[in-house]
């Protein structure tokens, strides 16, 4: 659960950073290579899990949020990550859990 929260947060940050770079006219592969060689380098950027439809992302974030509520722990980034993941899915035409029947 902790690993997945951090993974989806990295994927969300990668998506937003690469999207901004694209709008600035930066070549995506050159940007990715530069980021991998910087403090922004991370496993998700290297292995590109964002190229799959991320079927478990929202479920994972719902679990984290529920457990955090139960434990009375504030995890505000988790809610933001859940929304960014939805944005990525919408932008790429990937189904949400509801659309998949889950």
Walk through the language-model features, giving the residues of each.
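Helical "substrate-binding/catalytic lid" subdomain
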Residues: 1-102
